[in-house]
From Swiss-Prot:
Stored PANTHER family: PHOSPHO-N-ACETYLMURAMOYL-PENTAPEPTIDE-TRANSFERASE, PHOSPHO-N-ACETYLMURAMOYL-PENTAPEPTIDE-TRANSFERASE HOMOLOG
Reactions this protein catalyses: UDP-N-acetyl-alpha-D-muramoyl-L-alanyl-gamma-D-glutamyl-meso-2,6-diaminopimeloyl-D-alanyl-D-alanine + di-trans,octa-cis-undecaprenyl phosphate = di-trans,octa-cis-undecaprenyl diphospho-N-acetyl-alpha-D-muramoyl-L-alanyl-D-glutamyl-meso-2,6-diaminopimeloyl-D-alanyl-D-alanine + UMP
Places the protein is found: Cell inner membrane
Protein name: Phospho-N-acetylmuramoyl-pentapeptide-transferase
Pathway: Cell wall biogenesis; peptidoglycan biosynthesis
GO molecular function: metal ion binding; phospho-N-acetylmuramoyl-pentapeptide-transferase activity; UDP-N-acetylmuramoyl-L-alanyl-D-glutamyl-meso-2,6-diaminopimelyl-D-alanyl-D-alanine:undecaprenyl-phosphate transferase activity
Enzyme Commission designation: 2.7.8.13
Disulfide bonding pattern of the chain: none
Membrane topology: Multi-pass membrane protein
Source organism per UniProt: Azobacteroides pseudotrichonymphae genomovar. CFP2
Transmembrane segments: 22-42, 72-92, 95-115, 135-155, 208-228, 244-264, 277-297, 302-322, 326-346, 395-415
Length: 418
C-alpha cells in the first residue's frame, strides 16, 4: 500500500519518496514496525485472552516449574501474525508473486492453528483438531505452493550466473530465464541439485515426473517443518527465538538470490523478484523478537498452535520458493532434532517391547528439550540418563538458541564450500 503510494510520489520527484524503492530501507522499516506492533499490542491481547480464560491446560509431567505455568494464556501467536501482516501489507510490493505466496501461507496456517486452539482452549476439547485434519490442511498448502511455483510465469530463475572483469568493463552472462527444478545444496557440483537428475530413469514424461516429485517434496517439507516447530514449542521462548534466527538467514538468502553480483559470487541461482521477500523476512524476525518480550521466561503468554504451526510453515514455504529447501535440515536443526527425538523414542519403545516384552526408552522424555528439563532417579528402562540433575528451563532455551545461531552461520558458510 505505502509502497505504491511512495512509488507514485517518487515519480513526481517528491523529496524522500525514492527511499521506498530500496528494499533495504523498507526491510529496516518492516522489522522496526513489526517489533513495535508485537510489543505494544501484546499486552492488550494477553489481557483479552485472560478475560476470556484462554489459559493453557498443563499436564503434570513432573517437570521443574511446570505447575506454575497453569492458566497462562495461550493463542499468543495472534500477536505474531498481526505483527507480520501489517508491515508486509504496508511496505511490500503486493503484486509480487513471492510476497503473495507468503501471505497465503501465513493466513492459511494461522486459520488452521486458530481453529485448533479454539477447540482446545475455548471449547475445552484437549485433543484439538485431529492429526489427520491438520495433515490434510498442511498437504493442501504444500500442493498449492508447489503448483503455483510450477505454473506461474512470474516464477523463473537464471542459472550459471557469471560476472567477468575485462579491463574496466564487467560482462554478465547467464542462461535465459526458465522454470527450474534446481535447488541449492552444499558440497554438490556448482552447489546445485536438479530434481530432474532423480527422474533420469523416466524416459517418457520426464519433465512431468520431475515436477510431480518437486510438488511431493514441497508437501513433505511444509508438513515436516510446520510440525517440527509445533513440537519445539514446549519451553518459554524456544520456538520464537529459534524462528527469529532462522528468519535472519532466510532474509539474507532471499536478498543475495535476487542480486546478480551476490548470486554470481556465491555461485547460486539468480531469482529475480525474490528480493522483495527480504521485507517479509524482516517483519517475520521483528514479530518473533517482539513476541519474546512477552514469551521469554517466565512467559506471560504461549503462542499456541496458531503461532507454532504458522512459523514452521512460513519457514518451509519461504525456503522452497527461493530454492533453498534442502538447506533446512541444517538451518532448522533444532526443529529437526526435536522431531527426530520423538520418532526415535516411539520407534525404539515399540521395538524393545516387541523384542523383550518391556518397552524401553532412549530419552527420559521427548521432545528432547524435556529430556534435559527432567532430572531425578535413574530409571532402568531409559538408556540415556544424563543429565542426572534437571537443567533450568531458561538455560536450556539459551543453549538451544546458541546452537541455532551456530547452525545458521554454518548454513551461510556452506554456500562458499565447493
Amino acid at each position: 500500500m505505502l509502497y505504491s503510494l511512495f512509488y507514485f510520489l517518487s515519480s513526481l520527484n517528491v523529496p524522500g519518496a525514492r527511499l521506498f524503492r530500496y528494499i533495504s530501507f523498507r526491510s529496516v522499516l518492516s522489522f522496526s514496525l513489526s517489533l513495535i506492533i508485537s510489543v505494544l499490542i501484546g499486552e492488550r491481547i494477553i489481557r483479552f485472552l485472560q478475560r476470556h480464560q484462554a489459559g493453557e491446560t498443563i499436564r503434570n509431567l513432573g517437570l521443574e516449574g511446570q505447575i506454575q505455568k497453569k492458566g497462562t494464556p495461550t493463542m499468543g501467536g495472534i500477536i505474531i501474525i498481526i505483527a507480520i501482516l501489517i508491515p508486509v501489507l504496508l511496505l511490500a510490493r503486493l503484486s509480487n508473486i513471492y510476497v503473495l505466496l507468503m501471505l497465503i501461507t501465513t493466513i492459511w496456517l494461522g486459520i488452521l492453528g486458530l481453529i485448533d486452539d479454539c477447540i482446545k482452549v475455548i471449547w475445552k476439547h484437549k485433543e484439538g483438531l485431529s492429526g489427520k485434519i491438520k495433515i490434510i490442511a498442511q498437504v493442501g498448502l504444500g500442493l498449492i505452493v508447489g503448483l503455483i511455483v510450477y505454473l506461474s510465469p512470474n516464477i523463473v530463475m537464471y542459472e550459471n550466473v557469471e560476472i567477468r572483469q575485462q579491463g574496466g568493463r564487467k560482462t554478465v552472462s547467464y542462461t535465459p530465464p526458465l522454470k527450474s527444478t534446481q535447488t541449492t545444496v552444499p558440497f554438490f557440483k556448482n552447489n546445485n541439485l536438479d530434481y530432474r537428475d532423480l527422474t533420469a530413469f523416466m524416459t517418457n514424461h520426464r519433465t512431468a515426473a520431475t515436477w510431480i516429485l518437486f510438488v511431493l517434496i514441497t508437501v513433505f517439507i511444509v508438513t515436516a517443518v510446520s510440525n517440527g516447530a509445533n513440537l519445539t514449542d514446549g519451553l518459554d521462548g524456544l520456538t520464537a527465538g529459534s524462528s527469529a534466527i532462522i528468519g535472519v538467514v532466510l532474509g539474507i538468502l532471499a536478498y543475495v538470490s535476487a542480486n546478480l553480483g551476490f548470486a554470481a559470487y556465491l555461485n547460486i541461482m539468480y531469482i529475480p523478484g525474490c528480493g522483495e521477500l527480504t521485507v517479509f523476512a524482516s517483519a517475520f524476525v521483528g514479530a518473533c523478537m517482539g513476541f519474546l518480550w512477552h514469551n521469554a521466561f517466565p512467559a506471560q503468554v504461549f503462542m499456541g498452535d496458531i503461532g507454532s504451526l504458522t512459523l514452521g510453515g512460513i519457514i518451509a514455504v519461504f525456503a522452497i520458493i527461493i530454492h533453498k529447501e534442502l538447506l533446512l535440515p541444517m538451518l532448522c536443526g533444532i526443529f529437526f532434532t526435536e522431531s527426530l527425538s520423538v520418532m526415535i523414542q516411539v520407534a525404539y519403545f515399540k521395538y524393545s517391547k516387541r523384542k523383550t516384552g518391556m518397552g524401553k526408552r532412549i530419552f527420559k522424555m521427548t521432545p528432547i528439550h524435556h529430556h534435559f528439563q527432567k532430572g531425578g532417579s535413574e530409571e532402568v528402562n531409559v538408556i540415556i540418563q544424563k543429565p542426572l540433575n534437571a537443567i533450568p528451563e531458561s538455560k536450556i532455551v539459551v543453549r538451544f538458541w546458541l546452537i541455532g545461531i551456530l547452525l545458521a552461520a554454518l548454513t551461510v558458510v556452506t554456500l562458499k564450500i565447493r
